């Protein structure tokens, strides 16, 4: 009985000592958190291993992340994974669709993003671009003649329109001279004519009577305007004037209308500020609806695919410029010892318990061996 009690005692003591020793060793990895002094003498093994080597641990963790976890090869493989790409494209489509179907106005969205000033800047920029384009256009065309400046199709249209213009002018002239206003104007012209010819012609005019002269001249004028020869004459005159105009420089236009006036007139007609304001008052959905399907089905997948391709090709450079090792090192260095202890224990809790139990098991086995040795020695 005493023999079995001795063996049980040595086994129990061995297990307790082995388990406690391992448990103490694990605790000494983290504790104490700070060095302990007796007078000027620092107690050995203080602080614990991890608090003492925290800076070195931070450096090594940074290297481990860069060299073994977030490697260019691993990230590149992930970026080229077909399932990952499909998932990312689907996520991007959902998020973009949320944005482009928003019923809030563009103005409200700009204010929300603190870029409300973009309306003024956009107006000024558009007006500046229009002004520059017009000025560049005029600078170029002012070096041409009208024949060079106008397209061949315009030349043809003008030349084909000249006979019609002649007919229109004569038709309007006939209509005018048939009216009372035209007759009155013709009468005044006759009066002025006789008045300028001296007393003799004035006497003849008085003898014939003004009304009778107008009544005689008016039908002749109308008859003259209605003749084909008159139409051909006017057509020839207009044709000659057109030929002269084609040979003149476009720059001569500047003597009648200055560049600034042309630019100002075009800007007034375009109404840039009003157009921009109306555009911004529309909802995001109204603006994007015509191209919504194109954006979701073509633009988003294309952008995501190209972005992933670019990321795959430049992943090494990106990781290098991110300085991940330094980021990890800085973050770990800012951890308190308590937080670092919690972090390590949350990862290795079960394994550390097993180490404690293993120490108890080994201690118990050593106790059994000691008990057997004592038995044989007796």
UniProtKB/Swiss-Prot annotation:
GO cellular component: plasma membrane
Cellular localisation: Cell membrane
Its membrane topology: Multi-pass membrane protein
Disulfide-linked positions: none
Protein name (record): UPF0754 membrane protein BT9727_0767
Protein family membership: Belongs to the UPF0754 family.
InterPro entries linked to this entry: DUF445 (IPR007383), UCP032178 (IPR016991)
Transmembrane helix found in the keyword field: yes
The organism's taxonomic lineage, starting at the top: Bacteria, Bacillati, Bacillota, Bacilli, Bacillales
Transmembrane segments: 1-21, 357-377
Record's keyword terms, sorted: Cell membrane, Membrane, Transmembrane, Transmembrane helix
